[in-house]
């Protein structure tokens, strides 16, 4: 598997295999996206709720940056059309 010059589709496939991905031109060092799995949260009744959607399963793309983790990151059109993704 190549490690740089990836399309967004190739980056998604790499994340499904446990890899971290980033774009060359992102601002800030150490920023990347990865696939988060086994997602759960504590609701207002202090109950742990496991997220498990029939279509997407229990996974979401997480953006890790200088301010922490953003779960459910959404790619821009520029992100989706770029071929400058690389494996971290």
List each language-model region with its residue ranges.
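Catalytic phosphate/metal-binding cores of nucleic-acid and nucleotide-processing enzymes, i.e., regions
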Residues: 3-47, 52, 63
């Amino acid at each position: 598997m190549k490690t740089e010059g990836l399309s967004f589709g190739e980056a998604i496939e790499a994340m499904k295999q446990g890899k971290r991905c980033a774009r060359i031109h992102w601002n800030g060092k150490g920023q990347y996206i990865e696939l988060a799995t086994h997602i759960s949260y504590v609701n207002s009744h202090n109950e742990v709720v496991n997220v498990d959607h029939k279509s997407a399963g229990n996974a979401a793309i997480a953006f890790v940056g200088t301010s922490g983790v953003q779960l459910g990151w959404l790619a821009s059109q520029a992100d989706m059309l770029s071929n400058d993704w690389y494996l971290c």
